[in-house]
Regions:
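C-terminal helical cap/extension that packs against the catalytic core
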Residues: 51-106
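Structural beta-sheet core signal
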Residues: 44-46, 68, 108
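Short, well-ordered alpha-helices that flank and scaffold nucleotide-derived cofactor binding pockets
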Residues: 33-37, 78, 130-134
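Glycine/aspartate-rich loop-and-adjacent alpha/beta segment that forms the canonical ThDP
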Residues: 110-137
Length: 137
């Protein structure tokens, strides 16, 4: 029986106009799938521990900007290839920048296990939703 991935919590979940929470994205395949499926051209937010997949580099094509945050940000910065990457200590710092953008086109697709940032993808997804409400609503 075919499982419909779109019905899982935090799997490409549109939480408001232009904002998608894909916190369930715990590997590079799901991250790249999300970018391609949405033909995504906006701001991508990535976090988590990349050690599980052990890849040397990952090319991100499509998004306008890539924001990396969390305890694993330096490891991710060494691996991810994109012309416009910036790193932050926490997600609040990213929302602080994005709140000033008129057009909100945001994909939260971490592409890695939570590592030392969160206990699991559910906590991570709820944190994103809470900050979205705090900064945008």
């Amino acid at each position: 029986e075919k499982l419909n991935l779109l019905n899982l919590p935090f799997r490409l979940q549109k939480i408001s106009s232009g904002i998608i929470n894909d916190s369930k994205s715990t590997n590079s395949a799901s991250l790249l799938y999300a970018i391609n499926k949405l033909n995504f051209k906006g701001d991508l937010i990535i976090c988590g521990n990349p050690n599980k997949e052990n890849y040397s580099e990952l090319h991100i094509k499509g998004p306008r900007r890539v924001f990396i945050y969390g305890k694993h940000r330096n490891e991710l910065l060494n691996i991810l290839k994109h012309e416009n990457i910036s790193t932050f200590v926490n997600l609040d710092e990213i929302f602080n920048i994005l709140k000033n953008d008129k057009n909100k086109d945001i994909l939260f697709s971490p592409g890695n296990p939570s590592g030392n940032d969160y206990s699991n993808f559910i906590e991570r997804g709820q944190h994103f939703n809470n900050l979205k409400e705090k900064y945008f609503d």
